[in-house]
A protein has these predicted regions:
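Alpha/beta-hydrolase active-site loop
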Residues: 112-132
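Short, surface-exposed "cap/lid" segments of acyl-processing enzymes
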Residues: 53-109, 124, 128, 276
Length: 326
């Protein structure tokens, strides 16, 4: 199966395709997805919140479980989560959205947050879900969540198949250095970096109130790029020497050649966050990895149909790939 997405004529350009999908396109045709929340204790005495889509009718015990790992500053309320909720409901699949630390609306307890290469977090979450669920498990990561998921798949090798039936990354920055510099440059810096920092800085300051002296607040508030923010906050809190070390060691791209479970890596070539030149090529990945690289779609955009459009096509294509390969 190959999905060759083409943006509708009325939705030109990567930036427009990105912003429109997140803010204006229809996410679902029926009722807004409802979620039931579980709180899990973590191995390091912290917590994460996992949202389960509320089922309209009972599902069989062996129904597939669709696990969605969200992107930077995402949640179960993100446009892609609600679009996938509709698609998986129609297929009779369960759906869970495990939130990364601090992303569920409540600050976490430990002196840490989340990061792009957090494959250890992915590992224990998926292990717990495997213990609870007897049917197939399909794991999908969006943007940051997809990089972390593919890092996990690369680290696990053959053992990943004992946990999941397939993995998918959607618009994930598998080369974090290339993507980080792209977001911090020009129009991207003015739009996207500013948008992310507007929520990331207050959250970091909440962490400083919990743990005085954790970082320099003046340096953090002066950060006007993701590089500077990661250098002050993300990298040191998670065991990296600095941003360069973090972006290098956390990138999933070098590990794609070690993936031994059915995997799909989907990236639009006009994604404003991810330079097309940094995308993986077939000779850089294992035989288990399928690459979809449509020319359009933006960053987790992929709206389709007549104006005003909807977000059905990408979740359908990803789910269909899962049924054929997972």
């Amino acid at each position: 199966m190959i999905w060759d997405y083409r943006a509708p004529w009325w939705l030109p350009g990567g930036n427009f395709q990105t912003i429109y999908a997140a803010k204006l396109a229809r996410r679902y045709s029926g009722h807004k997805p409802q979620w039931s929340r579980e709180r899990w204790d973590t191995p390091d005495s912290d917590f994460v919140d996992v949202d389960w889509r509320v089922e309209e009718s009972p599902l069989t015990e062996d129904a597939p479980l669709f696990v969605l790992f969200h992107g930077l500053e995402g949640s179960s309320s993100s446009h892609y989560a609600e679009a996938f909720a509709e698609e998986t409901r129609a297929r009779g699949w369960r759906m869970a959205v495990p939130h990364f630390r601090g992303c569920s609306g409540e600050i976490n307890w430990a002196p840490r947050a989340y990061h792009s290469g957090d494959f250890e977090e992915i590992a224990w979450m998926l292990s717990r879900l495997r213990q609870q669920h007897s049917g197939p498990i399909y794991a999908v990561g969006i943007s940051l969540g997809g990089n972390a998921l593919m890092r996990w798949a690369g680290e696990m090798g053959h053992a990943a198949a004992q946990v999941v039936n397939g993995v998918v990354s959607v618009c994930s920055p598998v080369d974090l250095t290339a993507s980080g510099h792209a977001i911090d440059t020009g129009l991207n810096k003015a739009i996207y970096a500013r948008m992310f920092l507007a929520t990331m800085k207050p959250r970091a300051m909440q962490k400083l109130q919990q743990f005085p002296g954790l970082f320099d607040p003046l340096e953090l508030m002066a950060a006007n790029t993701l590089y500077a923010f990661d250098n002050v906050f993300t990298a040191p809190l998670h065991g990296f020497r600095g941003t360069d070390d973090y972006w290098d060691r956390a990138s999933a791209k070098p590990g794609l050649s070690r993936v031994q479970v059915p995997a799909l890596v989907l990236n639009a070539r006009n994604d404003p966050f991810i330079p097309a030149s940094s995308l993986p090529t077939q000779d850089q990945v294992s035989d288990h990895v399928t690459l979809w690289q449509p020319n359009t779609g933006g960053h987790v955009g992929f709206a389709s149909g007549r104006f005003p459009g909807d977000l059905k096509e990408m979740p359908w294509a990803v789910s269909e790939w899962m049924t054929q390969h997972g």
